[in-house]
A protein has these predicted regions:
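Active-site phosphate-binding strand-loop segment of PLP-dependent enzymes
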Residues: 2-67
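Generic structural signal for small/hydrophobic residues in well-ordered secondary structure
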Residues: 23, 30, 58, 74, ...
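A generic structural signal for well-ordered alpha-helical segments
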Residues: 48, 162-163
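Active-site PLP attachment segment
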Residues: 77-113, 125-128
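Structural signature of PLP-dependent enzymes
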Residues: 114-118, 137-159
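Conserved glycine-rich beta-strand-loop-beta hairpin in the small C-terminal domain of fold type I
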Residues: 134, 150-159, 170-183
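Residue-level detector of conserved catalytic or cofactor/ligand-binding positions
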Residues: 183-194
């Protein structure tokens, strides 16, 4: 919390073993609202390249960023396109929750393998979901920006209200639409059992 929910890269390094194959990141993050900085992502990319690791990068909240923060996809960094699975979807930025349409960008050999699994696991997304998603991606306009402004207004109000409650605190999230409340000052005793 004290570092804005940035990854502790020394801890990441300490956890890598010869059996480590991948690192999973979520930025903006659920549930903290943290957004990994470009500096952290560059250093993580160096770690991934040096240790021949794949990165699974969940970027479903990429459009929900506040206060001048910038989303950087780790796949855009040198040496990372060929080792990154970028996961995204329509549910968050385009308010299509429950429609179950997502997408992945990854090296071609992995996409081909995914297609073999997918073609026998899923029939297809409903036609209206495909059409709505194409329209959202191709004609994105003021709707997403208006939604982000409204989320920011709600976030600011909720953070202020939470931080005014004795014993509660929270940082102002930089992305997504979650608030991670610190309850460490509340002393809750263990329930007694008969």
């Amino acid at each position: 919390e004290e570092n804005g929910f940035q990854m502790d890269l020394d801890e990441v390094r300490s956890k890598i073993t010869p059996r480590t194959k991948a690192v999973v990141i979520v930025t903006p993050n659920n549930p903290t609202g943290g957004v990994l900085s470009e500096r952290v992502l560059k250093e993580l990319a160096e770690i991934a390249v040096a240790n021949d690791l794949m990165v699974l990068s969940d970027e479903v909240y990429e459009r929900l960023i506040y206060d001048g923060e910038k989303h950087v996809s780790i796949a855009s960094l040198p040496g990372m396109k060929e080792r990154t699975f970028t996961l995204n979807g329509m549910s968050k930025a385009y308010a299509m929750d429950g429609w179950r349409l997502g997408y992945v960008a990854a090296p071609e050999e992995y996409i081909l393998a995914m297609n073999k699994f997918h073609q026998y696991n899923t029939t297809c997304a409903p036609n209206f979901v495909q059409l709505a998603s194409a329209a959202a991606l191709n004609e994105e306009g003021d709707e997403v920006n208006a939604m982000v402004r409204e989320y920011k207004r709600r976030r600011d109000h909720a953070v202020k209200a939470i931080n005014e409650i004795p014993g509660l605190s929270c940082q102002c999230p930089k992305g997504a639409f979650y608030i991670f409340i610190n309850l460490s000052l509340i002393h809750i005793s263990e329930p007694t059992r008969p």
